[in-house]
From Swiss-Prot:
UniProt record similarity statement: Belongs to the tRNA pseudouridine synthase TruA family.
PANTHER family tied to this protein: PSEUDOURIDYLATE SYNTHASE, TRNA PSEUDOURIDINE SYNTHASE-LIKE 1
Protein name: tRNA pseudouridine synthase A
Record's function text: Formation of pseudouridine at positions 38, 39 and 40 in the anticodon stem and loop of transfer RNAs.
Molecular function GO labels: RNA binding; tRNA pseudouridine(38-40) synthase activity
Source organism (scientific name): Klebsiella pneumoniae (strain 342)
Length: 270
């Protein structure tokens, strides 16, 4: 057995924040920029060996994360500061490690997760934004957030989300359990906050697209329940844009004792 093989293997979890506007999504792909590729490159430089990461949720092109969780295995023995400050020094400015935690061998960023939470930020104003143009979705028609909130409550619990599932979704089942969904106005911003055990492809953006139709008065509040019951994607509204969507937190069993930080994004309180 070589000296390298005799060294212990460490399993490490990281909290990751990123602005997804310049990336073709989380997942590593040939010849395009991905968050995973940039993170693995930075980790490999610090570890001085090739590193592969596994994430809690693979976000699409243009989608952001303030609470993404990843894990990786390494034989490199480093101080926590190396996995935070050291890795951040090797990352582009729009990706950052927020925390580090050594985890037991049975931990998996995706399969150990019990819930994911997303926030979708709509800038509801007649005129488009400039500074936050890649971090919010602009919708110029006035939205009634209270109407959207009432309409959304039919989505709670375990349901078949075929009407809000992308045609190309590869999940074996359209059934998901929504634990909460809240629509709140903060001045010119309307935020849709949704937590579920997992999500089918484009589920949040498809729900938001339809909720905006309700909020704008183009559809009745009862429309969301009708869409859910219909199990037909063609009846729902267009998919909302990627730039307003953030993966803000991932839940794990308490015994893993992972850090819990403010979710954000931007000005949003927890």
């Amino acid at each position: 057995m070589s000296e390298m093989e005799q060294q212990p293997i460490f399993k490490i979890a990281l909290g990751i924040e990123y602005d997804g506007s310049k990336y073709y999504g989380w997942q590593r792909q040939n010849e395009v920029r991905s968050v995973q590729e940039k993170l693995e490159k930075a980790l490999s430089q610090v570890a001085n060996e090739p590193i592969t990461v596994f994430c809690a949720g693979r976000t699409d092109a243009g989608v952001h994360g303030t609470g993404q969780v990843v894990h990786f295995e390494t034989r490199a023995q480093r101080k926590d500061a190396a996995w935070t400050l050291g890795v951040n020094a090797n990352l582009p400015g729009d990706i950052a490690v927020r925390w580090v935690k050594h985890v037991p061998a049975d931990f998996h960023a995706r399969f150990s997760a019990t819930a994911r939470r997303y926030r979708y930020v709509i800038y509801n104003h007649r005129l488009r934004p400039a500074v936050l143009s890649h971090g919010v979705t602009h919708f110029h028609q006035p939205l009634d957030a209270e109407r959207m909130q009432r309409a959304a409550q039919c989505l709670l619990g375990e349901n078949d989300f075929t009407s809000f599932r992308a045609v190309q979704c590869q999940s074996r089942t359209p059934w998901r359990n929504v634990m909460h969904i809240n629509v709140t106005r903060y001045g010119a911003y309307v935020v849709v906050d949704i937590k579920a055990n997992a999500f089918v492809h484009h589920m949040v953006r498809n729900i938001v697209g339809s909720l905006m139709e309700v909020g704008a008065g183009n559809q009745p509040e009862s429309w969301m329940a009708e869409l859910l019951a219909a199990k037909d994607r063609t009846l729902a509204a267009a998919t909302a844009k990627a730039e307003g969507l953030y993966l803000v937190s991932v839940d794990y069993p308490a015994h893993y004792d992972l850090p819990v930080l403010p979710m954000g994004p931007l000005f949003l309180a927890d």
